[in-house]
Every structure is written in structure tokens, then in C-alpha cells.
Amino acid sequence: MHYDPIKNVFASLIKKYPFLRITFYKLLDIFFLRSWYVRRELMKLRKAFGAKTIEIYDAGTGFGQYSYFMSKKLNPTNIFSVDIKEDWIKDAEDFFSQIKTQDIKFNTEDLLQINHENRFDLILCVDVMEHIHDDIKVFSNFYRALKRGGFLLINTPSIYGGSDVHSNEDESFIGEHARVGYSQEDLVNKLHPLGFMTYKCQYTYGFWGDKSWRLGIKYPMILLNFSKLFFIILPIYYLITFPFTLLLMILDYNTKNKIGSGINFIAQK
């Protein structure tokens, strides 16, 4: 299954009206459990910097929802948000200009080719690395871009059921993925030789979270991939299922998962 065609539908719907984009951001924050985990860690990292202005690199900003959150909740900040999709960057740039946000700048960048030097205090990389074959090159670029003591927060599927792969015979549920995901050991083995050290690691989407993802994300996406007409019945579907999905998400969020289909990894330079 491919997410990008569905993402492009949403991108076209929200591009003209700021209130629609803000509403869309809030819905993403509610429906995607990974957003719960990422936002919690961002708030904790903000405290680690005290009152100083932090320079943030949103590496693979997508719709721009995390840049919006960080601009609102992590102040004072200067945020540099990039994505490889030029049209999405243009849409995000127009939106933040309309709502008169001054602390975010945008650019189209390929993470394999960036050459920032000792520029950022924090790099946020959410659901990006599973799309990139040469991940070591990107991690090396991130290390060079960070200031000494800076943090890299990676959120990605794990090898334990990420992309809905549970055995060697399974294919990734997401067609755009270059790999199934990572384990803690994978990330340690790739990041530590570059000079990073592990600050924190947490598996997400454990027993409860995996069930919430299937009910709240996987099954609706399968329907939408089959036909965009299913957009019409989505509100009814979520009206029936979301109370159960929300309960499962809350259970996962408050559980220390020994293993899970997602992973939050924070490295420090």
C-alpha cells in the first residue's frame, strides 16, 4: 500500500485555508500515537535547554505539524524545516506566513546532501529514516549539523512489526519504505561509531498501540487506497471505532513497552 497518494489528497485539501490546516494538525496529533510520544519527548528536551533559544532542524517536515507544535510549545526557538517535496514546502511556507509565524524558515533539501556545520541544538526526524537507503550518510550529516551536546530525536518503525512486517515472508504495508525499521541495537551500531551516544530509547506501539494502529490507521488507509470514495464514510467509521482506538492509545502511552512496532530514539552529540 502507498501512503503518498492519500497524503497528497490531504495536502490539496488544506493548502488554501489556514483554519483547515490547523484543524488537520490537531487531528494528526490525536489520531497518530507516534505524535503523542514525539511531543512528550520534545517537551522534556525543551526543559533540558533551560531558557535559551534553541535552534531546531525539522528534517522531513512533511505537512509541518511538528514545526507548528514546536513553534507554539518550545519557545524561544528558531526552526529550520526542510523536506524533499518542493510543493509541500511551498504550501507550509505560505501557511506559516499567513499566520504570521516568525521563528520558522523553510527550504527544500535532500538529507543525503545537506552540509550544515555545528548549527542546531536539536534535530527532529519523524518517520523519515525508513524511507532512505543510505541511512549512515544521513546520520553522519546530522552529526555534523548538530552543536556539541545537541540532540537527535528519531521516530521510526521498529523491526518488531514495523511496517506491519512480522516475518521474513511478509512485505511492508507501506510501499514507500526502504526498510522495515530499526531496533535499538541497529541505531546504536549505526550512531555510536559516528560519535553519538544514546540519551534515551523507548519502544512504542506495543501490544495496545499496535491494535490502535490497525483500527485507527491501517484499515481506513486500505479502504482509501482502494477508492477515494471511502472518504465519505470515514466520519461514520471513526464515530463508531475511535472511542476504542483512543482507549488502546492511552493504554500504550502509559505502558513501558518491552518491545513494539515503533521506536523513539534520542541520541546526543
Where are these regions (language model features)?
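Conserved SAM-binding loop
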Residues: R39-R46, I54-V165, F265-A267
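Short, flexible hinge/linker loops that cap or flank conserved catalytic cores
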Residues: G50, K73, N257-I259
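S-adenosyl-L-methionine-dependent methyltransferase catalytic module, highlighting the catalytic core
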Residues: H2-Y37, Q65, I84-W88, F95, ...
